[in-house]
Curated annotation (Swiss-Prot):
The active site is at C85 (nucleophile), H172, E174. Keywords: ATP-binding, Glutamine amidotransferase, GMP biosynthesis, Ligase, Nucleotide-binding, Purine biosynthesis. It comes from Shouchella clausii (strain KSM-K16). Pathway: Purine metabolism; GMP biosynthesis; GMP from XMP (L-Gln route): step 1/1. PROSITE patterns: GATASE_TYPE_1, GMPS_ATP_PPASE. It catalyses: XMP + L-glutamine + ATP + H2O = GMP + L-glutamate + AMP + diphosphate + 2 H(+). This is GMP synthase [glutamine-hydrolyzing].
């Protein structure tokens, strides 16, 4: 549980798919927000001193025994509460209203009619499009609550009890399909909770530098530098805080993109004047990964080997004892590794792949930030655009973009095909429009014909998505002529490839990475 000096709106997690988006939208307004378990007690919440509380959506029915509930004492704290979807149903059930199964599930865009201009709907149109996703509905609001909005299939689409600062909506204002959703959240944060908006990257830098100095003291930090956005921002931020007390270790695990190792060393040793130690451990990693096909096992092996290499190599730094290991763990990494009400999507390389007996204390200065906030932080720190906007690259590297067993041949295919993809996307001027793009190698071959000869070679998959924060994403609509150029080049320039496929699934149901 984090306690912050910023005015904070706490989101209680009841297991809904959009919970992280609520947190992100509130931060977009300049108000700090955190996602916490619904099991948080009233005393724990009070200790955090939030200016507002949001109950998230969730897949359960509030009237069913055993469904997630919050500490009832939370309602007595006097802090404004906004219930969203399951959150408003939970509030209704608690205060004696009636929630029942809807005759049909309402999912998608719906027209909302605002009947009462409560503070939540201040300045908003009487008719507006919202995003619904629910199988239950409120049949009767609790005593003391006013119905603020409805539609034909949802008689209580919004309700409020202004005297107790309790508000609820059946729709999802955090989803961009709700056309005035951001305005509604702004009304809650500023007009109802009294926020002033004191969350910014400039403030974050000042506070984080102070925290790093207090945590580290006169000791030393070893930073796992990969050259990706996250580790680069971590390195520059910590270097700004403690200077030469930071040593960056760049481990080439043999799973890097084309030209990555050379680029990293040049950028950070010459551009930022940092102490960077390069370790070539590619043979060691690939030996450990030989014959391994399970993606979770691959992640664990890579995570463990990283720490073991750090342990061994830091011991060789005779003049400095390394006490801390810095990581670029993000808020999304922590969320995706599972909460009380959500299943683990995948063990994250910065969260679930660490051995329990490691010899370092962790320092993770970005673990409260989303990816786009990290980019903004990088810009604020003066990091060049080519690094800030570098394609996101996972800690396990190409190890999770080669599905199945990892071999030198497969790595070469992914490395070369990915370089072509990145080159052509940049040529087409799409590199800032597309959130993330890469190639992956499915564990499959297919029949083809090249030069009048039958081939039986690999298929390369292209993944490209648009997103704002990486919590949800849609597949990118790359122009056909650009895709044609990419496909033609890969098949002609990369050996042992005879087929290209394009991944057109969103997140959810898929994750961005294939493993």
């Amino acid at each position: 549980m984090q306690v912050t000096n910023h005015e904070t709106i706490v989101v209680l997690d009841f297991g809904g798919q959009y919970n992280q988006l609520i947190t992100r939208r509130i931060r977009d307004l300049g108000v700090y927000s955190e996602l916490h378990s619904h099991k948080l007690t009233a005393d724990e919440l009070k200790e955090m001193n939030p200016i507002g509380i949001i109950f998230s959506g969730g897949p359960n029915s509030a009237y069913v025994e055993g469904s997630p509930k919050c500490d009832p004492a939370i309602y007595d704290l006097g802090i404004p509460i906004l219930g969203i979807c399951y959150g408003v149903q939970l509030m209704t059930h608690h205060f004696g209203g009636k929630v029942d199964k809807a005759s049909h599930r309402e999912y998608g865009k719906a027209l909302l009619n605002v009947e009462n201009q409560s503070p939540l709907f201040k300045g908003l149109p009487i008719e507006q499009t919202v995003w619904m996703s629910h199988g239950d509905k409120i049949v009767a609001p609790p005593e003391g609550f006013t119905v603020d909005a409805s539609n034909p299939s949802c008689p209580v689409a919004a309700m409020s009890d202004e005297s107790r600062n309790l508000y609820g909506v059946q729709f999802h204002p955090e989803v961009r399909h709700s056309e005035f959703g951001n305005d509604l959240l702004k009304n809650f944060a500023f007009d109802i909770c009294g926020a002033k908006g004191d969350w910014s990257m400039e403030n974050f830098i000042e506070e984080e530098i102070k925290k790093i100095r207090e945590q580290v003291g006169d000791r030393h930090v070893l930073c796992a530098l990969s050259g990706g956005v996250d580790s680069s921002v971590v390195a520059v931020l910590i270097h700004k805080a403690i200077g030469d007390q930071l040593t960056c270790m760049f481990i080439d695990h043999g799973l890097l993109r084309k030209g990555e190792a050379e680029s990293v060393m040049e950028t950070f040793t010459q551009g930022f004047n940092m102490n960077v130690v390069k370790i070539d451990a590619s043979e060691r990693f690939l030996t450990k990964l030989k014959g391994v096909t399970d993606p979770e096992q691959k992640r664990k092996i890579i995570g463990n080997e990283f720490i073991y290499v750090f342990d061994e190599e830091s011991a060789k730094l005779k003049d400095k004892k390394m006490d801390f290991l810095a990581q670029g763990t993000l808020y999304t990494d922590i969320i995706e590794s599972g909460t009380d009400t959500a299943q683990t999507i995948k063990s994250h390389h910065n969260v679930g792949g660490l051995p329990e007996d490691m010899a370092f204390e962790l320092i993770e200065p970005l673990n409260a930030l989303f990816k786009d906030e990290v980019r903004a932080l990088g810009t604020e720190l003066g990091i060049p655009d080519e690094i800030v906007w570098r394609q996101p690259f996972p800690g396990p590297g190409l190890g999770i973009r080669v599905l199945g067993e990892i071999t030198d041949e497969k790595l070469k295919i992914v490395r070369e095909s990915d370089a072509i993809l990145r080159e052509e996307i940049k040529k087409a001027g799409l590199d800032r429009e597309i959130w993330q793009y890469f190639t992956a190698l499915p564990n499959m071959r297919s029949v083809g014909v090249m030069g009048d000869t039958r081939t039986y070679d690999y298929t390369v998959g292209i993944r490209a998505v648009t997103s704002i924060d990486g919590m949800t994403s849609d597949w990118a609509r790359i122009p056909w002529d650009v895709l044609e150029i990419i496909s033609t080049r890969i098949v002609n320039e990369v050996e042992h490839v005879n087929r290209i496929v394009y991944d057109i699934t969103s997140k959810p149901p898929s994750t961005i990475e294939w493993e």
